Regions:
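Extreme N-terminal, non-catalytic leader segments
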Residues: 1-14
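Hydrophobic anchor at the beta1->P-loop junction of P-loop NTPases
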Residues: 18
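The conserved Walker
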Residues: 22
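Conserved lysine of the Walker
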Residues: 26
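Short amphipathic alpha-helices and their capping/turn segments at secondary-structure boundaries
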Residues: 30-35, 65-81, 104-117
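Conserved substrate/cofactor phosphate-moiety recognition/catalytic segment
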Residues: 31-74
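Conserved nucleotide-sensing/catalytic segment adjacent to the nucleotide-binding pocket
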Residues: 56-101
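A glycine- and Lys/Arg-enriched "phosphate-lid" helix/loop adjacent to the NTP-binding pocket
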Residues: 100-168, 172-175, 181
Length: 189
């Protein structure tokens, strides 16, 4: 399956990715950030896909989820203003696939490496766990926290670890995003 290159308009957007283990406030923060900046947030496609699946997911489903996530990203970036917030990215599929199946489809890795992100917001595990039919590993949050931390740190993409209440996380993220927007504005003049 071929995907179109990101449009030239979306290349001017600040790409922010909220990422972290299960049940760490990623979606909440993504929505709050997008609302604060009156822009779009790209929801996690896996959630909608799995909601419609009438069986346990299999490794082959992960590539379908990756394709759906990319389509969703392209769609939501079209109308974004100044920045776009991604509620996770393909890195989550790599982590889950390697954990559950011991390997990850090379196409998922290629697509992940071809995507551009300007900043990661890594959500900490200090938010209480809430049960959800799609959440699998409440006892492995610390393990996955370390996995995400290592992969984000080694990506070379600037990142900020966000801890505390949802409001504290939002305040810290806004400070970072405002700085990034100001830097971008200064270089474009």
């Amino acid at each position: 399956m071929a995907f179109a290159e990101i449009s030239s308009r979306s290349k001017n957007l600040l790409h922010l990715c909220v990422i972290g283990p299960e049940c760490t406030g990623k979606s909440t923060l993504s929505v709050m950030l997008a609302n604060h900046y009156s822009t779009n947030w790209v929801p996690e496609y896996a959630r909608a896909y799995l909601d419609k699946l009438n069986r346990p997911y299999e490794q082959t489903d992960l590539l379908k989820i990756a394709h759906g996530q990319i389509r969703l990203e392209e769609e939501w970036m079209r109308d974004a203003r100044r920045l776009v917030v991604f509620d996770t990215n393909l890195l989550v599929l790599k982590i889950w696939s390697e954990h559950k199946y011991g390997t990850c489809d090379p196409e998922i890795i290629r697509h992940h490496e071809s995507r551009r992100y300007d900043h990661y917001f890594l959500t900490d595990i200090d938010i209480p766990w809430e049960d959800d039919p799609q959440r699998e590993h409440p006892k492995l949050r610390e393990h996955f926290g370390k996995v995400y931390n290592e992969l984000v740190r080694s990506s070379g993409i600037p990142y900020t670890l966000l801890s505390g209440t949802p409001h504290q996380r939002l305040e810290k993220a806004i400070t970072i995003v405002d700085d990034l927007l100001n830097q971008r504005s200064a270089t474009n003049h």
